[in-house]
Amino acid sequence: MQPTNSEKFTEKVWEAIYRTQEMYKQAQQQQIETEHLMKALLEQDGLAISIFNKLAVPVDRVRDRTDDFIRRQPKVSGSGTSVYWGRRADALLXRAEEYRKQFEDSFISIEHLLLGYAQDSRFGKALLSEFRYPDEAKLRNAIEQVRGNQKVTDQTPENKYESLEKYGRDLTQYAREGKLDPVIGRDDEIRRTIQILSRRTKNNPVLIGEPGVGKTAIAEGLAQRILSGDVPQSLKDRKLIALDMGALIAGAKYRGEFEERLKAVLKEVTDSRGNIILFIDEIHTVVGAGATQGAMDAGNLLKPMLARGELRCIGATTLDEYRKYIEKDAALERRFQQVFVDQPSVEDTISILRGLKERYEVHHGVKISDSALVAAATLSTRYISDRFLPSKAIDLVDEAAAKLKMEITSKPEELDEVDRKVLQLEMERLSLQKENDAGSRDRLERLERELADFKEDQSKLNAQWQAEKSVITDLQKLKEEIDRVNLEIQQAERDYDLNRAAELKYGKLNELNRKVEETESQLSQIQKSGATLLREEVLESDIAEIISKWTGIPVSKLVESEMQKLLQLDDVLHQRVIGQDEAVTAVSDAIQRSRAGLSDPNRPTASFIFLGPTGVGKTELAKALAAFLFDTEEAMVRIDMSEYMEKHSVSRLIGAPPGYVGYEEGGQLTEAVRRRPYSVILFDEIEKAHPDVFNVMLQILDDGRVTDSQGRTVDFKNTIIIMTSNIGSQYIFEYGGDDDRYEEILSRVMEAMLSNFRPEFLNRIDEIIIFHSLQKAQLREIVKIQTHRLESRLARKMSLKLSDAALDFLAEGFDPVYGARPLKRAIQRELETTIAKEILRSNFTEGDTIFVDVGETERLEFKRLPSEVLTTQ
């Protein structure tokens, strides 16, 4: 039978036949024979390999023997153009045709060819007898295991064979191999799932909950219970297989191919007569999956089986996606019974983390302290509001352990510093060896001695690092071995091989535990010596550090240097904001309370209204605070309330409502705080905003949160809210620093506030702070601050010095009505302009010191000071 018509063969067989035409030419042989066809079949990642695997025949060795057989055949020279099929290859195809008829298939497939090899006296029998190949009955049995009850009705039958192996993951097998993490708690949800699965019809639970609460973990917990036999009789010895919708859709090129694959999966499940339970994670993906014009989607293919109880299916999806996809399809929704999976409490999360602790310790090769687990649960609840427990707490522990593992395997900082110093000294030595003068030789001798000392330190530190790393690595290997032995013990107990279980439990496991104790004592001795380079335990501070990296919130415990810094906050703010003692003290007290952990965790860190005339330092104090907390003024979120004068502009703060332009972009305020939850928010000139804006402010000030247009809760609990206003500034201006009239002025200002803002808004503010109008005595300090800023802008390494007379001259720019802002204009006009012109004329150059004084003409004079004058001053 010459293969001339591709329509008789499946695609894979025709590909193999086509490939043999190249093979026999490459091998320089006379004709195509059965060995060439076998090699072509083994090159495919297809059915031949699956059948050999079922028979426990090593595929690599079959491939090697086939290559050897081809090499031993006689070669011919010359380049013939015709393709010749050998007599035995022709006979093989004829036998395959007979098997096709026996199987009642429409096309010759790979399994028909393999059956034909059992009767090939030249190559097939010689090859298969070497591997003690079973008789034809066993070969047929292996083929039936792979094919199931499928018939070859099209040219791509392989898509339907072993569909569940291709498109699914056996969770019960994963549990048997110890690849699933232990599931702690969730007993009610697992029991409810089992209850629904035990129904006669519509026995399909769907797990609904927020992302990260543990929906998939419930399915894994059920797989572990099935394995341990802790389920009702109706679920004993069942298989739980997770369907991979991505794999099912991927590569389905032709119309109807996806439906064929899914039908093959469903046929395998129904043919198992209830032995297989299907788990579809992200079940909303079946709605519309694979649907093209006029084709059915996966959801519609599932519906009949789900309703009749032929298919037991567990689904999992989030609340939003369930509402968006499943609820719209009422026929699909009624076939599923809902199981709500709530977020676990902090206490339950700590229990879950304790259950997972050993797995993460073995994986990362580090120890995890219990305080770190408690910190992960409590700190993630407080500071990471847009994610859910236990996922966010587990991620924290995982990342902290990974960070510590990275530090263990990387070179320690002390050793790295010594290595760099040795490299630097060696480079200096090479340079000095080229010099011949006496001074260089003396320096070389001293350098040699210094280098010898550093090299000695280097070798000691290196030896210590390697010793510590070796002990920690040994400990990890021992723990991995204990994990593997525990898995073997569980397997032996399930198989009732009690002798093996006892041998492992009381022999090998005890020996490994003893070695672990010895290694741990060895490590603790190294650590007690105080000279340790590596740390191998994840602590609470590591968790706090990861949270700080995720959110930008300084969660870590206060170290000595930061305590000192916070105590000096009052002084730091006073250096920038002159003459506003009450305001500075109130703000610094709020920050100190927050960082010491005493502020109310359910409200913003602090909220202030700064009242006062223009130019007295209201905005400057907010900038100074942002610079202190974040080292940059740019970290302040500034909202100019003059932009929110219209009623509709409220939507710009929290995002446009659905259907409006900009809905996807979110709000200016909410997005800024979501990206940076620890920030100073300045609402500048709040009296200019529309009254409706303050409705949004109420919940921010009271509960420390607001819901944006997308339905996300944005957390303001770690923000400092500062609002500035000019209301009542005329009364403050009248006050003029007279302490006797302060109470009277305060009551008049509050009356003005009540006439502009509602009481419920003012009642939520922590403190309303009045900024006094500036006095002439404070102006010289402000001028100094402004000239220091000018000096920092002189990017040409120039210095600026002003005489007392020059400072007083610039202070004349003060106007009590406009505050300190006219000073800026005076400095710009009198100082900056002249210096700029002198630089352009090259009168001042890099390294100069510019001295400014008042001349006889009552104008500022600029001089360049020589360096000797500077040294005598």
Swiss-Prot record:
Keywords: ATP-binding, Chaperone, Coiled coil, Cytoplasm, Nucleotide-binding, Repeat, Stress response. Residues 162-343 are annotated as: NBD1. Residues 85-149 are annotated as: Repeat 2. The keyword Transcription does not apply. Residues 774-873 are annotated as: C-terminal. It is found in: Cytoplasm. ATP 2 binds at G612, P613, T614, G615, V616, G617, K618, T619. The keyword Cytoplasm applies. One of its GO terms (cellular component) is cytoplasm. Induction: By stress conditions, such as excess light and low temperatures. PROSITE patterns: CLP_R, CLPAB_1, CLPAB_2. InterPro entries: AAA+_ATPase (IPR003593), ATPase_AAA_core (IPR003959), Chaperonin_ClpB (IPR017730), Clp_ATPase_C (IPR019489), Clp_N_dom_sf (IPR036628), Clp_R_dom (IPR004176), ClpA/B (IPR001270), ClpA/B_CS1 (IPR018368). ATP 1 binds at G209, E210, P211, G212, V213, G214, K215, T216. Residues 562-773 are annotated as: NBD2. Signal peptide: none annotated. The Clp repeat (R) domain probably functions as a substrate-discriminating domain, recruiting aggregated proteins to the ClpB hexamer and/or stabilizing bound proteins. The NBD2 domain is responsible for oligomerization, whereas the NBD1 domain stabilizes the hexamer probably in an ATP-dependent manner. The movement of the coiled-coil domain is essential for ClpB ability to rescue proteins from an aggregated state, probably by pulling apart large aggregated proteins, which are bound between the coiled-coils motifs of adjacent ClpB subunits in the functional hexamer. Homohexamer. The oligomerization is ATP-dependent. Part of a stress-induced multi-chaperone system, it is involved in the recovery of the cell from heat-induced damage, in cooperation with DnaK, DnaJ and GrpE. Acts before DnaK, in the processing of protein aggregates. Protein binding stimulates the ATPase activity; ATP hydrolysis unfolds the denatured protein aggregates, which probably helps expose new hydrophobic binding sites on the surface of ClpB-bound aggregates, contributing to the solubilization and refolding of denatured protein aggregates by DnaK. This is Chaperone protein ClpB. The gene is clpB.
